[in-house]
Amino acid sequence: MGLNRRQFLIGSGALGGLSAVSWLHSLLPQKTVLAPAVADPSISLPIQPEPIAIAPKGLTAPGRGDVRIVVISDLNSQYGSTTYDPEVTQAIALIPDWQPDLVLCGGDMVAGQKTSLTDAQIQAMWQGFDQQIAAPLRRAKIPFGFTIGNHDGSGAIAQGKMRFQRDRDQASRYWNNPQHDPGLKFIDKAGFPFNYTFSQKGIFYLVWDASTDRIPENQLAWVEKSLASSTAQSAKMRIAIGHLPLYAVAVGRNTSGNVLSNPDPLRNLLEKYQVHTYISGHHHAYFPGKRGQLELLHTGALGGGPRQLLNSQLSPTKTLTVIDVNLNSESTLYTTYNMKDLSVIQTKSLPRIIVGVNGWVLRRDLTWEELPPQEQKI
């Protein structure tokens, strides 16, 4: 949405911020050194079959990985809206033809975070979401993982209380209704739908509540315990999902309150437990980035208000991303579609590096040494 929401986000971290900072800075990433594998020339390795290219008819078809994930985000329209932009409707209709194992949503499924909305209006928004998005995916038997966005159930605190408690109550009521089962294999759903873990096809997924700029200390302790668990560490890959990104990438979002506070300690926490990718929304701009050992998928908006990338003259674009995962190499391939004409966005057309209010993000296909000297001077 292109409406003014910054004031709702900035005040969210009044409680627990300082203790979370000191707790986070005690975390250091752990590096694992592996001995290089030596191939035995006497062993004949099987020929790997070419990946099967799968996509809706007429679209560029990527080769399918061991696991395929369709990633969407920021679906909503204006405050209180119960309908969705045509690109959202089109995407939901196309998704089954990509044959994904999972759909992930980076948040903002409905258009709340306005105190004047009544309970009936909030319920109507979730009903509209169910009819137009969740139910079609359930009928297609495609599991749906998601993170709560600030417009779904903001955790903003004012005068010691949740400012949007009604939004959070309605979100919880909707998602804990057995009729709205998202089809996930939960590991820990005690905090569902705000923070939870699940697994699928060898990948461990952790969802934290990044509906505001600060993640509470008790939730960070839960994050570390979850990632340190034998279930997480025995998985072939680990992916984390939250609404706000670690670092800014978009015009109009390059301010405190629109990114997670203390991004480097948070990144260190994820790196410590070998999380491969952090998927976020909120900035309404697609950027496939990385920082340190962590890949950062900034998911573009599918609904209202796409935004321009920082350090770029590219036009704002509504997007959908298909991730194909190779579990053996622990690598991912992104195919991101411009939902205006369904063309594929070329990674090399995006900025090499984005420098925002709280740090920089490198495009994930590059190394620091490949940047021009002037871009290394940040």
Put a short name on every predicted segment.
Residues 36-61, 117-236, 262-274, 291-300, ...:
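Extended active-site neighborhood of metal-dependent phosphoesterases/phosphodiesterases
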Residues 29-123:
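N-terminal active-site segment of His-dependent metallophosphoesterases
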Residues 7-29:
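N-terminal export signals
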Residues 72-73, 103-107, 144-149, 208, ...:
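Active-site neighborhood of phospho(di)ester-bond hydrolases with catalytic His/Asp-centered motifs
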